[in-house]
Design a protein with these regions (language model features):
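Substrate-recognition/cap helix-loop segment adjacent to the acidic, metal-dependent catalytic center
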Residues: 13-23, 389
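Interdomain "pre-motor" coupling segment immediately N-terminal to P-loop NTPase/helicase cores
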Residues: 136-190
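Short, polar loop motifs at secondary-structure junctions
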Residues: 9-16, 496
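Helicase motor core with emphasis on the C-terminal RecA-like subdomain
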Residues: 186-192, 196, 200-202, 214, ...
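Short, small-residue-biased leader/transition segments that mark boundaries at the very start
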Residues: 2-7
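Acidic, Mg2+-coordinating catalytic module of metal-dependent nucleases/exonucleases
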Residues: 46-128
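Short alpha-helix plus adjacent loop in nuclease-associated cores
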Residues: 20, 25-50, 340-347, 480-481
Length: 496
């Protein structure tokens, strides 16, 4: 892209300065994403220069550019006549495309373009989208958006350089494919219907209710409609589905990425594994529990468009690698789990959470977003001061108003008791007694890292097989211990 722009700015003005020159300037770079949208990269691969110290080979570059041009011409001719007319009519006055369109003797129309789009993309876009506005204001972006919509693989993504030069592409795809119309159409009634997609992705017929309240369904619908929200769900109340379903829907409709920010690394792995067990491989996590090879593969999956859900910890937002891979993707929503960590009134306050708004603002500026990226916040804490702190934070940093979804239902399946003991030895004996009585998966919380290993070892020696889990363990050991607990190989895990 850079070389192409340098050529047009510096070399072309000398080559074409003579009025007697009748050469046509064709830039294959701009044509490739239109004709090869399944590939998120330019098809001109310089495989003779895989080592960065090697010298450029301009002759070979020219040969490859010629081969690419011939491929593009062949692909253009394979398009239906109506699709050729559509692309040509959208791009006819644009310098980036005029050379190629002249070379292929493209035909144009001046009227009836919206009707042609509706005919060619029936069932793929909302039939009530404002096509006249898009054609008038964003013809190039619309052409690239339609090319992406044509792809059969939802993991295909628009190349980063296209998004940089035509940032409106993401806005257009969202308008055409992920904005529910008020009038109602076949596309919106199926692809944007949450009950239809709940059955498609998870096999459920209906959403969970809380003492008759359809909280899960209402919060999911709000997310699909692009609203920012704060949901107060009881622990184990199905909050994951509330953001996973909209994320999967957006992955299919706009090739989008939902970023889930959580301080709980073990929970990230658990959710990714649970989705994989359902045959949903769209989720990826990048955190400190990963070894370098697995981390590299996860990053590659995000870059290649294979991920619709990315789980990261808040401190990862300071990583330049994370920023780079997110800039190249269409981020449709930020989900913040354990949102009470924003509030300085709680014991779980985390300074890294205060960077989230700054990161989102910087991301929106770099991507030249036309609309704010919505956020979903989840917490099980319903204290009014904490709720106000969360709402105030997003209003002040991103000018977002959060719709509140709070359940009045209480957790009837939880029982608490406080047991008095005189000494540490009495405490251990009572714990061992409780473990023996229960004979079920048990999590024992301790206050110090060293105690996780000490207590797990002591329980194991007494015949109650247990494993430790804390932040200072090696990633491989943490993953192995978590898997052993989740797969019922051990019933007790000692957690910091």
């Amino acid at each position: 892209s850079a070389a192409s722009d340098v050529y047009k700015r510096q070399d072309a003005k000398y080559l074409f300065a003579n009025d007697t020159c009748h050469w046509i300037l064709v830039d294959t770079l701009y044509i490739s994403p239109l004709l090869f949208p399944e590939r998120p990269y330019h098809r001109l691969v310089k495989d003779d220069k895989l080592i960065c110290e090697q010298m450029n080979n301009p002759v070979n570059d020219c040969k490859k550019a010629k081969d690419l041009l011939l491929d593009e011409i062949a692909c253009w001719n394979l398009l239906s006549k109506k699709k050729r007319v559509l692309f040509a009519s959208l791009l006819k006055d644009k310098k980036e495309f005029e050379g190629f369109l002249s070379m292929v003797s493209a035909e144009y129309i001046h009227e009836g373009i919206p009707k042609l789009i509706k005919e060619l993309y029936a069932g793929k876009i909302c039939q009530h989208a404002d096509l006249d506005m898009l054609i008038e204001q964003y013809p190039c972006g619309l052409a690239y958006a339609l090319a992406l919509i044509d792809t059969t693989d939802y993991r295909s993504i628009t190349p980063g350089w296209v998004l940089y030069n035509y940032p409106e592409v993401e806005f257009i795809v969202k308008l055409l494919r992920h904005t529910t119309c008020h009038e109602g159409c076949d596309y919106c009634h199926t692809q944007l219907d949450i009950l239809y997609n709940l059955k498609t992705f998870f096999g459920y017929e209906c959403f969970r209710t809380y003492e008759g309240e359809p909280l899960q369904e209402r919060a999911t619908q709000a997310a699909v409609e692009g609203k920012s929200l704060l949901a107060i769900f009881p622990t184990g109340g199905g909050k994951s589905l509330t953001f996973q379903l909209p994320a999967l829907m957006a992955g299919r409709s706009v090739h989008g990425l939902t970023v889930v920010i959580s301080p709980l690394q073990s929970l990230m792995k658990d959710q990714v594994d649970n989705l994989a067990d359902r045959g949903i491989t769209d989720a990826v996590t990048i955190n400190g529990m990963l070894d370098p090879i697995t981390r590299s593969l996860s990053i590659q999956r995000v870059q290649d468009g294979e991920a619709s859900l990315l789980y990261i910890s808040p401190e990862m937002l300071r990583s330049k690698t994370i920023e780079r891979i997110l800039i190249a993707r269409h981020v449709v929503r930020f989900v913040i789990d354990e949102a009470h960590c924003f509030s300085s009134w709680g014991h779980d306050f985390r300074v890294d959470y205060l960077y989230i708004g700054k990161f989102i603002r910087k991301y929106q500026q770099k991507k030249k977003c036309k609309n704010p990226i919505p956020v979903s916040c989840f917490t099980a804490t319903a204290k009014q001061k904490v709720i106000q702190d969360i709402c105030d934070y997003f209003k002040q940093t991103l000018d977002l108003n959060l719709d509140l979804f709070a359940s009045t239902a209480s957790r009837t399946n939880l029982h608490y008791s406080v047991i008095h003991v005189e000494s540490d030895n009495d405490k251990y004996l009572k714990l061992r007694e409780l473990v023996a009585e229960s004979d079920c998966p048990t999590i024992v919380y301790v206050s110090r890292t060293k105690r996780t290993k000490e207590l797990a070892g002591k329980l194991t020696r007494d015949g109650y097989k247990a494993l430790p889990f804390d932040g200072k363990m090696e990633a491989d050991e943490k993953n192995a211990n978590q898997d052993a607990f989740m797969n019922d190989q051990v019933h007790i895990i000692c957690l910091l």
